[in-house]
Design a protein with these regions (language model features):
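The feature marks the first
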Residues: 17-18
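Short, surface-exposed, charged amphipathic helix/loop patches that serve as local interaction elements
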Residues: 2-5, 12, 21, 25, ...
Length: 202
């Protein structure tokens, strides 16, 4: 009896991404390199404006343009249907997606199951120390305050570095783990640990 092979995530293969926008549209893209994901994240900034009377308003500056630029780099079917900036953003969101399916504590480790494009993958990371989490938080964001606004930028590189420190094992990949998957796994562990740490002392 022939065994069914479990799909694995392969960043080297092409991805056909369908979206719904006035009907179904499809395009073929390659998965961005870590360097492209780094640049994409660094280019984004969120500005929080303070309008008075305690009414802040947040704005993601140039995000449609940033998504469209990455989409143009990774699209491989150049003769396919035209995608506007909003549709390009939908495609980037689809290939970036890491949906966490499960988190299990195993002693001092966490086993994270995730659904990623075309596969289900698993990461086992050890529990970070308080200092590792503190250093990661400081390095992951840049906050610049002005008179009536605050600008925030986020960086992926610190999540990659922390993932490599915490890494015990991973499964479901044909090659290296992409930075966006590392970042999602690290965020999930930190978030889960924060929930566990909220228990009142006895």
């Amino acid at each position: 009896m022939e065994q069914t092979k479990t799909p694995v995530f392969d960043a080297a293969k092409a991805f056909v991404v369908p979206i719904l926008s006035g009907g179904e549209k499809r395009c073929e893209v390659r998965f961005p390199s870590d360097e492209e994901w780094y640049a994409w994240a660094r280019a984004q900034r969120t500005v929080r404006h303070f309008l008075g009377r305690g009414k802040p308003q947040s704005e993601d500056v140039d995000l449609p343009k940033i998504n469209a630029e990455l989409f143009a780099k990774i699209r491989t079917d150049k003769d396919g249907p035209e995608f506007d900036d909003a549709e390009a953003g939908m495609v980037i969101g689809r290939i970036e997606r890491c949906a966490v399916a499960s988190v299990e504590r195993e002693g001092i480790n966490y086993r994270i199951g995730m659904k990623v494009p075309g596969a289900r993958v698993t990461h086992v990371l050890r529990m970070p120390t308080a200092k590792e989490m503190q250093d990661h938080e400081r390095a992951s964001t840049s906050v610049v305050a002005a008179r009536r606004s605050v600008e925030t930028r986020a960086f992926l590189e610190p999540s990659g570095a922390l993932y490599d420190k915490l890494h015990v094992s991973h499964d479901g990949y044909a090659g290296a783990v992409p930075i966006v998957h590392k970042s999602a796994a690290v965020s999930e562990v930190i978030g889960y640990l924060a929930i566990e740490g909220d228990d009142d002392p006895e």
